[in-house]
Protein backbone atom coordinates (compact mmCIF):
# COMPACT_ATOMS: atom_id res chain seq x y z
CA UNK A 1 0.00 0.00 0.00
CA UNK A 2 1.38 3.40 -0.97
CA UNK A 3 1.80 5.99 1.77
CA UNK A 4 0.78 9.62 1.43
CA UNK A 5 4.42 10.62 1.00
CA UNK A 6 4.54 8.73 -2.29
CA UNK A 7 2.39 11.41 -3.90
CA UNK A 8 4.34 14.49 -2.83
CA UNK A 9 6.34 14.57 -6.06
CA UNK A 10 4.25 12.57 -8.53
CA UNK A 11 0.62 12.49 -9.58
CA UNK A 12 -1.47 9.39 -8.85
CA UNK A 13 -1.88 6.94 -11.70
CA UNK A 14 -5.32 5.72 -12.81
CA UNK A 15 -6.66 3.52 -10.05
CA UNK A 16 -4.56 5.21 -7.35
CA UNK A 17 -6.68 8.36 -6.96
CA UNK A 18 -9.28 8.70 -4.22
CA UNK A 19 -12.88 8.12 -5.38
CA UNK A 20 -14.34 11.42 -4.17
CA UNK A 21 -18.10 12.00 -4.21
CA UNK A 22 -20.93 12.96 -6.54
CA UNK A 23 -22.22 15.91 -4.50
CA UNK A 24 -20.44 19.27 -4.55
CA UNK A 25 -19.17 20.66 -1.26
CA UNK A 26 -21.47 23.23 0.42
CA UNK A 27 -20.75 26.79 -0.72
CA UNK A 28 -21.92 30.24 0.37
CA UNK A 29 -22.32 31.80 -3.06
CA UNK A 30 -21.29 35.39 -2.27
CA UNK A 31 -17.78 36.83 -2.57
CA UNK A 32 -16.82 38.27 0.80
CA UNK A 33 -14.87 41.17 -0.74
CA UNK A 34 -16.96 42.32 -3.71
CA UNK A 35 -20.37 40.73 -3.11
CA UNK A 36 -20.53 39.02 -6.49
CA UNK A 37 -21.53 35.35 -6.86
CA UNK A 38 -18.83 32.70 -6.72
CA UNK A 39 -20.71 30.27 -8.94
CA UNK A 40 -22.96 30.99 -11.92
CA UNK A 41 -23.27 31.24 -15.67
CA UNK A 42 -21.22 34.48 -15.87
CA UNK A 43 -22.69 35.39 -19.24
CA UNK A 44 -20.57 37.88 -21.15
CA UNK A 45 -17.54 37.35 -18.91
CA UNK A 46 -14.36 35.33 -19.46
CA UNK A 47 -12.94 32.65 -17.17
CA UNK A 48 -9.56 31.08 -16.48
CA UNK A 49 -8.07 28.91 -13.73
CA UNK A 50 -4.66 29.63 -12.22
CA UNK A 51 -2.58 27.48 -9.89
CA UNK A 52 0.35 29.20 -8.20
CA UNK A 53 0.85 27.58 -4.84
CA UNK A 54 -1.35 27.95 -1.76
CA UNK A 55 -4.66 29.30 -3.00
CA UNK A 56 -5.24 31.58 0.00
CA UNK A 57 -2.71 34.15 -1.15
CA UNK A 58 -3.19 33.39 -4.83
CA UNK A 59 -6.88 34.34 -4.72
CA UNK A 60 -6.11 37.72 -3.14
CA UNK A 61 -3.68 38.50 -5.94
CA UNK A 62 -6.53 38.32 -8.43
CA UNK A 63 -9.48 39.80 -6.54
CA UNK A 64 -7.38 42.98 -6.27
CA UNK A 65 -7.00 43.29 -10.06
CA UNK A 66 -9.38 45.91 -11.54
CA UNK A 67 -11.67 44.29 -14.09
CA UNK A 68 -11.88 40.97 -12.26
CA UNK A 69 -15.55 40.27 -11.52
CA UNK A 70 -15.17 37.44 -9.04
CA UNK A 71 -12.72 34.83 -7.77
CA UNK A 72 -13.07 31.50 -6.02
CA UNK A 73 -10.69 28.83 -4.81
CA UNK A 74 -10.96 25.17 -5.61
CA UNK A 75 -9.30 22.04 -6.88
CA UNK A 76 -8.59 21.25 -10.52
CA UNK A 77 -6.45 19.18 -12.84
CA UNK A 78 -6.82 15.87 -11.04
CA UNK A 79 -9.04 12.81 -10.97
CA UNK A 80 -11.08 12.96 -7.76
CA UNK A 81 -14.54 14.57 -8.09
CA UNK A 82 -15.57 17.04 -5.38
CA UNK A 83 -12.46 16.38 -3.31
CA UNK A 84 -12.02 17.81 0.17
CA UNK A 85 -9.06 19.88 1.33
CA UNK A 86 -7.63 17.00 3.35
CA UNK A 87 -7.93 14.67 0.36
CA UNK A 88 -6.13 17.14 -1.89
CA UNK A 89 -3.39 17.60 0.71
CA UNK A 90 -2.85 13.83 0.72
CA UNK A 91 -1.66 14.08 -2.88
CA UNK A 92 -4.02 11.27 -3.85
CA UNK A 93 -6.44 13.34 -5.95
CA UNK A 94 -4.07 14.72 -8.59
CA UNK A 95 -5.55 18.19 -8.14
CA UNK A 96 -3.68 21.43 -7.77
CA UNK A 97 -4.99 24.26 -5.61
CA UNK A 98 -6.53 26.63 -8.14
CA UNK A 99 -8.14 30.04 -8.38
CA UNK A 100 -11.09 30.56 -10.70
CA UNK A 101 -10.84 34.08 -12.14
CA UNK A 102 -13.93 35.52 -13.82
CA UNK A 103 -13.18 38.77 -15.60
CA UNK A 104 -14.44 41.40 -18.00
CA UNK A 105 -12.00 41.22 -20.89
CA UNK A 106 -12.99 44.74 -21.93
CA UNK A 107 -11.75 46.04 -18.56
CA UNK A 108 -8.69 43.84 -18.02
CA UNK A 109 -6.78 41.92 -20.67
CA UNK A 110 -5.83 38.29 -20.39
CA UNK A 111 -2.22 39.42 -20.86
CA UNK A 112 -2.47 41.50 -17.69
CA UNK A 113 -3.77 38.50 -15.75
CA UNK A 114 -0.93 36.39 -17.11
CA UNK A 115 1.56 38.99 -15.94
CA UNK A 116 0.04 38.91 -12.45
CA UNK A 117 0.24 35.12 -12.52
CA UNK A 118 3.88 34.87 -13.61
CA UNK A 119 5.15 37.60 -11.27
CA UNK A 120 3.31 36.30 -8.19
CA UNK A 121 5.14 32.99 -7.82
CA UNK A 122 8.18 31.00 -8.92
CA UNK A 123 7.00 28.85 -11.84
CA UNK A 124 10.24 26.83 -11.94
CA UNK A 125 9.73 24.88 -8.72
CA UNK A 126 7.82 21.83 -9.94
CA UNK A 127 5.74 20.12 -7.28
CA UNK A 128 6.14 22.83 -4.67
CA UNK A 129 5.96 26.55 -4.10
CA UNK A 130 8.38 27.92 -1.55
CA UNK A 131 8.07 25.89 1.64
CA UNK A 132 4.78 24.36 0.50
CA UNK A 133 5.62 20.96 -0.97
CA UNK A 134 3.38 18.57 -2.87
CA UNK A 135 1.65 18.10 -6.19
CA UNK A 136 -1.24 20.31 -5.04
CA UNK A 137 1.09 23.34 -5.16
CA UNK A 138 2.18 22.93 -8.77
CA UNK A 139 1.96 25.86 -11.16
CA UNK A 140 -0.86 25.68 -13.71
CA UNK A 141 -2.88 27.67 -16.23
CA UNK A 142 -6.14 26.03 -17.29
CA UNK A 143 -7.57 27.86 -20.29
CA UNK A 144 -11.17 28.09 -21.46
CA UNK A 145 -10.48 29.24 -25.04
CA UNK A 146 -7.93 28.48 -27.73
CA UNK A 147 -6.90 32.14 -27.71
CA UNK A 148 -6.12 31.95 -23.99
CA UNK A 149 -4.10 28.79 -24.55
CA UNK A 150 -2.05 30.34 -27.34
CA UNK A 151 -1.44 33.47 -25.27
CA UNK A 152 -0.44 31.43 -22.22
CA UNK A 153 2.13 29.45 -24.22
CA UNK A 154 3.55 32.62 -25.76
CA UNK A 155 3.77 34.29 -22.36
CA UNK A 156 5.57 31.26 -20.94
CA UNK A 157 8.18 31.43 -23.69
CA UNK A 158 8.65 35.18 -23.22
CA UNK A 159 8.98 34.87 -19.45
CA UNK A 160 11.35 31.92 -19.78
CA UNK A 161 13.82 34.17 -21.57
CA UNK A 162 13.73 36.64 -18.68
CA UNK A 163 14.06 33.91 -16.06
CA UNK A 164 16.95 32.24 -17.87
CA UNK A 165 18.78 35.55 -18.05
CA UNK A 166 18.27 35.92 -14.29
CA UNK A 167 19.68 32.45 -13.58
CA UNK A 168 16.46 30.50 -13.05
CA UNK A 169 15.70 27.06 -14.45
CA UNK A 170 12.97 25.83 -16.75
CA UNK A 171 9.35 26.78 -16.22
CA UNK A 172 7.33 23.76 -15.05
CA UNK A 173 3.87 25.34 -15.35
CA UNK A 174 1.17 22.99 -16.65
CA UNK A 175 -0.80 24.75 -19.41
CA UNK A 176 -3.98 23.03 -20.60
CA UNK A 177 -6.93 23.58 -22.90
CA UNK A 178 -9.72 22.86 -22.48
CA UNK A 179 -9.75 23.61 -18.78
CA UNK A 180 -10.53 20.66 -16.50
CA UNK A 181 -13.50 20.68 -14.14
CA UNK A 182 -13.12 23.21 -11.33
CA UNK A 183 -14.30 21.81 -8.00
CA UNK A 184 -15.08 24.54 -5.49
CA UNK A 185 -13.23 24.28 -2.19
CA UNK A 186 -14.87 24.42 1.21
CA UNK A 187 -16.39 27.71 2.41
CA UNK A 188 -13.62 28.25 4.95
CA UNK A 189 -11.06 28.62 2.15
CA UNK A 190 -13.00 31.13 0.05
CA UNK A 191 -11.50 34.64 0.39
CA UNK A 192 -9.47 33.25 3.29
CA UNK A 193 -7.19 36.25 3.67
CA UNK A 194 -10.16 38.62 3.80
CA UNK A 195 -11.49 36.59 6.73
CA UNK A 196 -8.02 36.25 8.27
CA UNK A 197 -5.92 39.30 7.22
CA UNK A 198 -2.90 38.01 9.13
CA UNK A 199 -3.30 34.47 7.83
CA UNK A 200 -0.61 32.44 6.13
CA UNK A 201 0.52 33.49 2.68
CA UNK A 202 3.51 31.59 1.32
CA UNK A 203 3.55 33.20 -2.12
CA UNK A 204 6.75 34.79 -3.30
CA UNK A 205 7.70 35.77 -6.82
CA UNK A 206 11.11 35.64 -8.44
CA UNK A 207 11.47 39.41 -8.70
CA UNK A 208 11.84 39.00 -12.47
CA UNK A 209 9.51 41.25 -14.45
CA UNK A 210 7.26 39.62 -17.03
CA UNK A 211 7.49 41.46 -20.37
CA UNK A 212 3.85 40.92 -21.36
CA UNK A 213 0.78 42.89 -20.36
CA UNK A 214 2.66 46.14 -19.88
CA UNK A 215 0.70 48.01 -22.51
CA UNK A 216 -2.38 45.79 -22.64
Curated annotation (Swiss-Prot):
What is a GO molecular function of this protein?
peptide-methionine (S)-S-oxide reductase activity
- What parts of the sequence cross the membrane? none
Disulfide bonds, which pairs?
none
What does the record give as the reaction this protein catalyses? L-methionyl-[protein] + [thioredoxin]-disulfide + H2O = L-methionyl-(S)-S-oxide-[protein] + [thioredoxin]-dithiol; [thioredoxin]-disulfide + L-methionine + H2O = L-methionine (S)-S-oxide + [thioredoxin]-dithiol
Among the Pfam families in the record, one is: PMSR
| Oxidoreductase among keywords | yes
Does the keyword section mention Oxidoreductase?
Answer: yes
Record keywords: Oxidoreductase
Which EC number(s) does UniProt give?
1.8.4.11
Gene Ontology biological-process annotations: cellular response to oxidative stress; protein modification process
- Record-annotated active site: 54
The entry's cellular-component GO terms read: cytoplasm
Which family would the database say this protein is a member of?
Belongs to the MsrA Met sulfoxide reductase family.
* Role of this protein: Has an important function as a repair enzyme for proteins that have been inactivated by oxidation. Catalyzes the reversible oxidation-reduction of methionine sulfoxide in proteins to methionine.
Which NCBIfam families does this UniProt record tie to the protein? msrA
Which named protein is this?
Peptide methionine sulfoxide reductase MsrA
What is the native source organism of this protein?
Xanthomonas axonopodis pv. citri (strain 306)
Q: Which gene encodes it?
A: msrA
Amino acid sequence: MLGIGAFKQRLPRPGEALPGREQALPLHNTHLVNGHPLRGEFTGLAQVQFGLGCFWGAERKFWNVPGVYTTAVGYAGGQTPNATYSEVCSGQTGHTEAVLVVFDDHAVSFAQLLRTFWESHDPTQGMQQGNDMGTQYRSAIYCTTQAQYDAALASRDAYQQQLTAAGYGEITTEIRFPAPTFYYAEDDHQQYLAKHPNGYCGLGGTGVSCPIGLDA
